[in-house]
A protein has these predicted regions:
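Extended alpha-helical targeting/anchoring segments
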Residues: 1-583, 587-630
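N-terminal beta1-alpha1 cap of cysteine-dependent amidohydrolase-like domains
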Residues: 236, 372, 549-710, 715-718, ...
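Charged helix-capping and loop-helix junction motifs
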Residues: 319, 506, 707-714, 796, ...
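Catalytic beta-strand/loop cores that center a nucleophilic Ser/Cys/Thr
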Residues: 491, 762-810
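Cysteine-nucleophile active-site neighborhood
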Residues: 678, 690-769, 776, 827
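A glycine-centered loop/beta-turn motif at secondary-structure junctions
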Residues: 788, 799-846
């Protein structure tokens, strides 16, 4: 039942321009106009969120959104969501509780006038559901969806803002159970905004916007806040960024020495040293790196991002945020004040964006950094600059790691987009800034009509730059070896608006502050040829900017103990130790320097509401969607894709769907009977003599470890009744099922290889059209084979004898060791189209045994 929409009153007030929203928030806390909580030595804000965007190329402020009053606080822990009414908005909070209880009655487990507890168990991940059904099943994200969809007559409201922990992934995917560590951020914590402040810095304008069912109280609160903002704007004080942030200090060449002078300590006065202590020592972290490399060699992952933390005192998190904002302005600046913790950061990298205006979702991976070619006087030496760009573009390791992240982003966007709309709008563009240049790509797609922005966000969790690939196996390794929850680190901060606008950033270059101490976490991207000591040093480089901001906020300089050798002559990030140009490799947990967001980039800046967006009254009730795009007449070739927990599965799905075929996705953790049932021809298919095609996806590890994979392949080979194509791990499963063996052939990840098409391949339906020219293919594997069993014929091999493609001599079974779906395989779509079309050709023998009858 859809409840009668609440009729909130909307109040807007143009107010005096506040150039520094962080200082304004401090002022409002002192005057009691925002929620506050007492901590030793001060009163700090609570239940507020500050989101800011800074153009770091010019250091000009762009946009600020501040949640000054919230109606409710939503906290997710596991499958439980607690919704609490906040004291400054009791009427609105009570209305929200009533709306949620009415819309989600089956999930209510406890209710008082001040609190509602919901339980939303996750959809099973045992493979029993087709993947689209699983993605759109009810989840703990439903309360956010429903509150954001309430009808308010204003483009900026309704709005929910907050943080998703890295560990939110474990609420809908099976990850090892680990204890809570120093970062106690819940799975998510969001606020339903009642009054927000929107600041447009380029026009030096600001507006208070509020919505409430208690119009009189809202008018009074907005008027109080307007007067306070005007009073604050008239206070004398240092000029802060209406157009430019203060110029940051030069990068230090190493840990500061006791007794060195420091700003704020007076001329010649020594600054105290504040020591940051690592949560994991050098030797232990290097051992973690080596363990990760063993997993890479075993074919479990292509890359993985372990992390460690650094702790130091932090009595005033908002002061630390101010220091970070001035020294390291970034596209995504954030400060979140919750009852038990504060979270601050300056992130350079978006997580997932959804534009309500265009209906597009986008991911922008950043990986690969070089210094600008600066001359002795600090100006750009264009000749040197060009040489450094060429070095960046041609560095095999940089390019391979960047391509891996691009293929991963293509997968995540394809999973939630209309087939055929996913595209790489920028591939390895070199963006230049004042001190560094980066490789940047962008992947966009049109969001599928049966999904919304929150579905897309869950489908893309977590970002590959903080996890690795394949994501799920990498996340399992991260949890097992780090041994505790990551909390906010590697999660996302941002907002969701009523029209569906979603703007989130990755929580990196951040500090989690609780009980007077800051925890700053940083990771290192581990690949096969990583140097463990250098990866440990990389975490120091990445944490330093935030640690220095925390120290400066206390009038101190930073000490950080052991300094390991540099990972690269140009170590990562704008904030590195020992790099006067602030340059680096920064391929994971990006530490880019200045980046100017594109006009459509969110960067915590509100974009215009979509003029054709549906109103909240048109929003469907939860649960609201099921299944894949239907094929009512049963005319399309049907492909049943077995997902072996890979991060490129939806690149295959999108490619197959653009060929006009219907795709159903089941996880390899499904019972074999579930997949066998999906492979049975429908009556319409039987009438046309058509059989579904089984597609075996890539995946981590050995084929024998991937659920029902081997059982299905053995049956397909034995019966010859199921046309089958295997990719990478799927190819290896075919080799094993036919009596061959796969083993280590050396890690090759994100690399293009030129292969030789054999005589059999030149006659094969899939490869014959391409046999006249070179065949360049993408490889992501550590396992493979150089010797095929008698039942398989090689179609393509590498120069060192690794088999890249093979076909069964009798059964309609073909395997590709390479990845046709990758951007590195130019002829991949043509190969897959020819292959699946050939396998799906109608047959006349309707008496062939079914796969079900053999098992």
């Amino acid at each position: 039942m859809t409840p009668t929409p609440l009729p909130p009153r909307v109040v807007t007030r143009a107010v005096a321009y506040p150039p520094d929203a962080g200082r304004l928030l401090e002022h409002l806390a002192r005057t009691g106009l925002v929620g506050t909580v007492g901590v030793p030595g001060r009163t700090r804000p609570v239940d507020t969120v500050l989101l800011e965007s800074v153009d770091t190329a010019t250091k000009a402020s762009r946009t600020t959104i501040a949640v000054l009053q919230a109606s409710t606080r939503l906290t997710c822990e596991g499958d439980a969501v607690t919704v609490e009414v906040l004291p400054q908005a009791r009427a609105d909070g009570a209305a929200s509780l009533e709306a949620l209880a009415t819309r989600l009655p089956a999930h209510v487990t406890a209710r008082t006038p001040e609190r509602l507890t919901l339980s939303v168990p996750p959809a099973p991940d045992d493979g029993s559901l087709e993947e689209r059904e699983r993605l759109t099943a009810p989840s703990t994200i439903e309360p956010l969806r429903l509150l954001a969809a309430r009808k308010v007559d204003h483009p900026h409201l309704p709005l929910v803002a907050g943080v998703f922990a890295f560990d939110y992934l474990a609420t809908f995917e099976s990850l090892p159970a680990v204890p809570t560590g120093g970062n106690t951020c819940p799975d998510y914590l969001f606020y339903e905004a009642r009054i927000i402040l929107v600041v447009d810095h380029p026009t030096r304008s600001a507006t208070l916007v509020g919505a409430s069912v208690d119009g009189a109280d809202l008018e009074a609160r907005v008027e109080e806040l307007a007067e306070a903002v005007t009073a604050f704007a008239s206070l004398p004080g240092p000029a802060t960024p209406s157009g430019r942030a203060p110029t940051p200090e030069p990068a230090h060449s190493g840990p500061e020495r006791p007794g060195s002078a420091h700003p704020g300590c007076g001329p010649g006065r020594p600054a105290p040293v504040l020591e940051a202590r690592p949560t994991v020592g050098e030797a232990d972290f290097e051992a973690v790196v080596r363990t990760m490399q063993e997993a890479i060699s075993a074919g479990e992952v292509y890359q993985v991002v372990p992390s460690r933390g650094f702790t130091l005192p932090c009595p005033d998190a908002l002061a630390a945020y101010h220091e970070l904002r001035e020294a390291n302005p970034s596209p995504y600046m954030f400060y979140l004040a919750a009852p038990g913790f504060e979270l601050l950061g300056a992130s350079p990298e978006s997580a997932l964006l959804h534009s309500a205006r265009t209906g597009e979702v986008s991911i922008r991976p950043i990986a690969g950094t070089r210094p600008r070619g600066l001359g002795p006087e600090g100006g750009v030496d264009h000749e040197r600059d060009t040489r450094l760009e060429l070095e960046l573009r041609t560095d095999a390791k940089e390019v391979a790691e960047h391509v891996m992240l691009v293929d991963l982003a293509r997968n995540d966007v394809a999973r939630v987009s209309v087939p055929g709309t996913r595209r790489v709008t920028d591939l390895m563009r070199v963006d230049r800034y004042s001190r560094v240049m980066h490789l940047v790509s962008e992947v966009t797609g049109t969001l599928a009509p049966d999904l919304d922005a929150l579905d897309a966000f869950r489908a893309s969790m977590t970002m590959g730059t903080l996890t690795g690939a394949p994501k799920l196996r990498a996340a399992e390794l991260v949890r097992a070896l780090e041994g505790e929850r990551r909390g906010s680190y590697g999660g996302s901060v941002g907002y969701l608006r009523g029209d569906g606008e979603l703007d989130t950033c990755i929580v990196i270059r951040s500090a989690f502050v609780a009980d007077g101490r800051a925890l700053v976490q940083a990771g290192a991207g581990v690949v096969a040829d990583s140097v463990p000591a250098a990866e440990a040093a990389e975490t120091v480089h990445k944490a330093r900017a935030v640690l220095e901001a925390v120290a400066r906020s206390q009038g101190a300089v930073l000490g950080i103990g052991h300094r390991a050798p540099s990972k690269d002559p140009t170590p990562a990030g704008d904030d590195v130790v020992g790099s006067p140009t602030g340059a680096g490799t920064g391929c994971h947990e990006a530490t880019p320097g200045p980046r100017t967001p594109s006009p459509t980039a969110g960067a915590h800046g509100p974009r215009p509401a979509a003029p054709t967006a549906p109103t909240a009254s048109e929003a469907p009730t939860a649960p609201r969607r099921t299944g894949s795009t239907p094929d009512p007449h049963g005319l399309r070739t049907r492909v049943v894709l077995l997902d072996n927990r890979d991060s490129f599965v939806y690149n295959l799905v999108d490619l197959i769907a653009t060929l006009g075929m219907q795709v159903e996705v089941y996880r390899s953790s499904a019972p074999a009977a579930t997949v066998r049932s999906a492979l049975e021809p429908t009556p319409a298919e039987r009438e046309r003599g058509q059989r579904p095609v089984l597609c075996l996806s890539p995946g981590p590890g050995h084929p024998r470890d991937s659920g029902c994979l081997m059982e299905l392949v053995r049956a397909a080979v034995a019966t010859s009744s199921v046309p089958t194509v295997g990719i990478c791990l799927g190819f290896q499963a075919i080799v094993e099922a036919c009596g061959g063996r796969v083993g280590p052939v050396g890690p090759v990840h994100g690399r293009s290889t030129r292969v030789e098409v054999t005589a059999a391949g030149r006659a094969d339906a899939a490869l014959a059209p391409l046999a006249g020219g070179p065949l360049d293919v993408a490889r992501y594997h550590s396992l493979g084979t150089r010797a095929l069993p008698a039942d398989l014929t090689a179609l393509a091999v590498t120069t060192d004898g690794v088999v890249m493609a093979a076909r069964h001599v009798d059964a309609p079974v073909v395997g590709l060791q390479f990845h046709p779906e990758s951007v590195l395989t130019p002829h991949g779509p043509a190969i897959l189209k020819a292959l699946v079309t050939d396998l799906a050709a109608p047959v006349n023998d309707a008496t062939a045994p079914s796969i079900r009858s053999t098992l």
